[in-house]
């Protein structure tokens, strides 16, 4: 739904005055891209107030989710427990970008395996591998190695899968 990788690149540039765009290369992660002496500081970026507040929405996300909502009951599950300052930012982001999703269909959780839906679209392997329904991977550089899931490279792929 958002470009979290872009936020890491932006904050890295501000903090170290260096480019981290290599993070966008498929297969790259923070752990294999950031110099070891900076990694601990970079891993703290999402723990800062405001990290999630104004993340850009991915192209097509709003339109496709709105179309999906006409055929399916849509829930947004976000793993918010890891980053204690993100609740308000994430909720405000959802109200701004997906105002048609009712608050009753927004789930803040730590472990997405509790979500009892038919499908889960996620970029994190830890969420996909514990999901009991059909896990679907949304492409991000850190999950390029995943081969066992149906993969969506963009929101048009999601529309093609569910709306055709």
What annotation goes with each model-predicted range?
Residues 105-131:
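Conserved Lys-Pro-Asp/Glu-containing loop-to-beta segment of HAD-superfamily phosphomonoesterases
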């Amino acid at each position: 739904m958002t470009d979290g990788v872009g936020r890491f690149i932006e904050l890295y540039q501000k903090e170290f005055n260096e480019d981290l765009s290599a993070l966008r290369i498929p297969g790259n992660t923070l752990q294999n891209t950031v110099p070891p002496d900076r990694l601990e500081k970079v891993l703290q970026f999402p723990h800062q107030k405001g990290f999630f507040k104004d993340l850009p929405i991915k192209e097509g996300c709003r339109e496709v989710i709105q179309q999906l909502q006409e055929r399916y009951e849509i829930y947004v599950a976000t793993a918010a427990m890891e980053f204690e300052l993100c609740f308000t930012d994430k909720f405000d982001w959802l109200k701004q970008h997906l105002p048609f999703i009712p608050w009753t269909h927004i789930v803040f959780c730590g472990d997405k395996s509790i979500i009892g839906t038919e499908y889960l679209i996620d970029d994190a392997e830890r969420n996909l591998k514990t999901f009991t329904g059909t896990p679907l991977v949304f492409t991000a550089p850190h999950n390029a190695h995943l081969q066992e899931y149906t993969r969506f490279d963009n929101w048009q792929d999601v529309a093609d899968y569910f709306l055709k």
